């Protein structure tokens, strides 16, 4: 048994930590993207509605 090789549970723990970090990163990125896209969509709808009302009169 070589001393350089880390224990199995340590490797598993590291993989779990990496998985958690990646999941958190992806989740936060998708949430931020979703919020900004929703905000832009609502702004666009509002301006489009105002433009259509102005041009219908």
Swiss-Prot record:
List the GO biological process terms: symbiont-mediated suppression of host NF-kappaB cascade
Cellular component GO terms, alphabetical: host cell plasma membrane; membrane; virion membrane
Give UniProt keywords alphabetically.
Host cell membrane, Host membrane, Host-virus interaction, Inhibition of host NF-kappa-B by virus, Membrane, Transmembrane, Transmembrane helix, Virion
Main localization is virion
Membrane-protein topology: Single-pass membrane protein
Cite a single Pfam family from the UniProt record: SH
Q: Which residues lie on this side of the membrane: Virion surface?
A: 1-8
Which organism does this record belong to?
Answer: Mumps virus (strain Edingburgh 4) (MuV)
> Could you confirm whether the keyword Transmembrane appears in this record?
yes
Q: Mind telling me what this protein is named? A: Small hydrophobic protein
From which domain of life does this come?
A: Viruses
For this protein, the record's InterPro entries field holds: SH
């Amino acid at each position: 048994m070589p001393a350089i090789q880390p224990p199995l549970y340590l490797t598993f723990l590291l993989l779990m930590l990496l998985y958690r970090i990646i999941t958190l990163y992806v989740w936060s990125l998708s949430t931020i993207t979703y919020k900004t896209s929703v905000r832009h969509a609502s702004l666009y709808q509002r301006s489009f509605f105002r433009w259509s009302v102005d041009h219908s009169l």
